Amino acid sequence: MMLLVIFVLPAGCGDKDLVEVETMSFEQYYLQEKSEICVPEQVVCGTECAWAITTGKNDVIYQVAYGNESPEVKEITWQQDEAEHLISIAYENGKLYAMVRMDEGKTLEIRYYRLGGEFETYRAIEAEAEQGLAVGTLFWVDAEKNVYIAEGNVVTRFDAGTGEKTGITLDGTPCVFLETENGVECLVEESDGIGLYGIEGKNVKKRWKIKKAVRNLKTVRNSDAETLFLVSGSALMLVDRATGTLLAETDLLLMGAHDVLAGNYETEDSTLWLFQKGNGTEGRLEISQFERKEAGTEERRIQLVYGTMGTINEDVDDSIKAAIMQFNQENKNYYITIKNYHDDVDLRRLHAEFASGNAPDILDLTYSFYYESYVQNGYLTDLRPYLERSDYKDDIIWNVLDTYQIDGGLYLLAPQFSITAMAVHPEYAAEIETWNMQTFRTLLEENQWEKDVWQGYGEAERLLYKMLTGRQSEFIDRENETAAFETEEFMKLLELCKSYQESYREDAYEWTSEDLIQNELCMPLIFEDVGTYLSGTEFYGREYALYGYPTEQGQVYGVDVCPDCCGIYAGSPNKEGAWEFIESLLEESHQKWHTGVNKGFPIRKSLLREVQEEWQPITFSNGEKVSMTEAE
């Protein structure tokens, strides 16, 4: 797989602005998707091997050798006493260091390890106050054995000889320490870019800054002393070490990489090793090996942009990230990059791009607040014609997708969905033959507010919101843009709410789960996936019927989309390519993978049945741990 990206080059002195630069590309020729190392927390790289620690309590340190297609993994024991806790590791000048918390946090021991040997204690740092020591977010030891611990924007340096503490304040979050011929340096994640600071004793000097959005800054160890490989979010950047000039950049998703913890690059043979945090609950360490190609290698595929409303720390959900990587590795005509619109400023920029015709080809519609507005303004493509000719057409649960149709058109695809329903207390449920608004009113008359309703706790607004769910069309004429809230039916709803308000329960917010089960006449239930649905039989201790929100004609169930919901920008010149990606979300590899990792029911009937048949009973908590029986 070849890849090419257009890069940005800082110009001028000090702060570096961005202009276009040359390209670089990598080809992957080894991938170990699931190593034996589960839930890695930190990886550091040396010249011959890397070391990894996990989130597992008292787990060993794992040593991973470079240089072959099946990296050898060895286990290194660091623990000398049961009460110890491994906090962090660091590598410098041929030594691996470990920071270990002891004595309930009142002592930190710094230990070092020589290849083939054992850990030996180098220094103990004692707490100066009763509350114990802050372990910090970054730990490092330089060639002279001075210890550095960062917390927030402050670095504390412990002198190798005297142990004297020196506090150093930086203009951002320290992420990586480096040692060069110029002394100790620190890469800092700032609000508007990446800064490099020189540290000499108490003195700090800013060497350069790159003005570029930064997230989860890491480095890839580089045998070339004149350049730095930096990782920020999904970007891999090559930077001039002395000036901060951005020489080249590529997108990790194009390389089939993601969530990089560390890496090692050897200039001599242009080999790059990347260590990545895997997806899913186990999150096994993924190890990839790449070869850098010569400059000028061109990406001949067409670029598609996936616009997401992610967060500042994460662009997209794990399932979409995996789908994009698979698409980039397999598709011969298109590749996808991600553009994140994570705050109000970015959202306004997206709306401006809609108006100018420059919006992303594919749009994340997980948070569909603007869905109707986007459709009305002509920003989204009707996907129904694409679905009608899809091989998956007859396997789709259409009544779920049809929830989102507007004027006969369907402008989003929800590969996964969740369901909101309600349960009626068994004391009253036996009398129900049909379920609609009249049945609901009859229940209320019998109950006389003895039990709460829909967890409204006596608040009229909550009850009105629930009773209007699924009934908007009874009161709002969207075609003629009129509303009728003075009807007899609406007045009846208001009277119910007024009566409900008088039953306000001050203690309801303190109810336990058992109290809720006993005191709720109608309990709202959200089923996020097959597991929550099948295990839900334990709610009342036996099976029970599920109902939708009552309407005059019957009932409606609530449906919500999951983080892989998306649509196609109407102005995209690459709609066919965008559809190829969206249709790939209906493939079994995505449908089942998503369900195994994230919440959601598959939108394909056949796969929903398979997932249901394959689901295993689990132990879950409702007051106390209970295991489902086969009968349940």
Question: Which residue stretches match the model-derived regions?
Answer:
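Hinge/lid segment of periplasmic solute-binding proteins
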Residues: F369-A421, I432, Q438, E543-T551
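Extracytoplasmic "Venus flytrap"/periplasmic binding protein-like
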Residues: N333-I396, I432, D515-M523, G536-Y540
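Beta-propeller fold detector
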Residues: E22-M24, E72-Q79, E120-A127, T166-L170, ...
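Extracytoplasmic/periplasmic substrate-recognition and gating elements
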Residues: T537-E613, I618, V626
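Glycine-centered hinge/linker elements that transmit conformational signals in sensory
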Residues: E479-W511, L534-S535, Y547-Y549
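Extracytoplasmic ligand-binding site segments that recognize negatively charged/polar headgroups
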Residues: I397, D407-V424, A430-K498, I517, ...
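Conserved N-terminal structural module of periplasmic/extracytoplasmic solute-binding proteins
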Residues: G14-E69, I89, M102, C175-G183, ...
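C-terminal capping/gating helix-and-loop segments adjacent to ligand/active sites or protein-protein/ligand interfaces
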Residues: I320, D560, F620-E632
